[in-house]
């Protein structure tokens, strides 16, 4: 996609996000659906769309670490833990950090932590940079159906009018690996 078309698609996506709605976009492995993490209305729309309970918690995807800092508590990280995390970012590894009390429950669910990732997908980086903050990100699929890997699959599952940022996934076969930021424990193999 040329830069003008990508810029137009990102601008249109930001308009949708500002309306507290949900968008779809390509990530490292599959298409994701996402929204403004600070909008309870938008997150509830996403959870309803996915038929996902709020208590499960969500993942935030960001252009850089600074975008994630308001949502996580990194004060307990040692220098070695920081090095480990930053050696994997940007990239397809999600880390679960402690969350401060100010992080909304609609993001953390029943947990006192939050899963976050600094992406290396160029389109998502550009989207988060243009929006100025991270996005809630979960796989684009309706309950019981496989995650979408193309724009056509997103439209087939969510409807022709669903707002999609067109582009290619990063080509990975599996969703992101998920690890505990403090212990390194593997929660999901990538």
Swiss-Prot record:
InterPro entries: DHBP_synth_RibB-like_a/b_dom (IPR017945), Sua5-like_dom (IPR006070), TC-AMP_synthase (IPR023535), TC-AMP_synthase_SUA5 (IPR050156). It is found in: Cytoplasm. It catalyses: L-threonine + hydrogencarbonate + ATP = L-threonylcarbamoyladenylate + diphosphate + H2O. One of its GO terms (cellular component) is cytoplasm. GO terms for biological process: regulation of translational fidelity; tRNA threonylcarbamoyladenosine modification. GO terms for molecular function: ATP binding; double-stranded RNA binding; L-threonylcarbamoyladenylate synthase; tRNA binding. Residues 7-190 form the YrdC-like domain. The gene is tsaC. PANTHER family: SUA5, THREONYLCARBAMOYL-AMP SYNTHASE. Its EC number is 2.7.7.87. Its main location: cytoplasm. Keywords: ATP-binding, Cytoplasm, Nucleotide-binding, Nucleotidyltransferase, Transferase, tRNA processing. Belongs to the SUA5 family. TsaC subfamily. Required for the formation of a threonylcarbamoyl group on adenosine at position 37 (t(6)A37) in tRNAs that read codons beginning with adenine. Catalyzes the conversion of L-threonine, HCO(3)(-)/CO(2) and ATP to give threonylcarbamoyl-AMP (TC-AMP) as the acyladenylate intermediate, with the release of diphosphate. PROSITE patterns: YRDC. This is Threonylcarbamoyl-AMP synthase.
